[in-house]
A protein has these predicted regions:
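Conserved phosphate- and dinucleotide-binding cores of soluble alpha/beta proteins
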Residues: 1-125
Length: 126
């Protein structure tokens, strides 16, 4: 019952606040790597993952991996995209590729980052 109450709240959000993750940070977490990695990423080549946002991996083109959604426990992609403000903060220069993919996906509506990261993203657009 508790999760149903929360799930109903997801349908009426005004804002989401998030950060980005890299696949390397997922792999650095021994527990996640050993217990979830083999199943979640079995059909996804490591080099194809540009980043992760709200638990979902995507490629540099901003495409989310479709088979991944069934493993998500929490807010659905549909509810994420219906939320009008999706605010993201990126402050690590090593996340420029993750940021570029996320921006291409359309999942971010508002962004806070610094000039150096923005410049790195612009350099990688082509």
């Amino acid at each position: 019952p508790y999760f149903k109450v929360i799930e109903n709240c997801y349908h009426h959000l005004d804002m989401l606040f998030t950060g980005l993750s890299t696949f390397q940070s997922f792999q650095a977490n021994q527990f996640l790597k050993e217990n979830y990695g083999p199943e979640l990423f079995k059909d996804i080549p490591d080099c194809d993952v540009a980043g992760m946002i709200m638990g979902r991996p995507y490629n540099i083109k901003g495409e989310f991996f479709p088979d991944f959604e069934q493993h998500i426990c929490g807010i659905s992609m549909n509810d994420i995209m219906k939320t009008p403000i999706r605010f993201c903060v990126v402050r690590n220069r090593f996340k420029s590729e993750a940021l570029l993919g996320a921006l291409r996906s359309g999942i971010i509506t508002h962004l806070v980052t610094n000039d150096a990261i923005a410049q790195r993203v612009l350099q990688n657009i082509d």
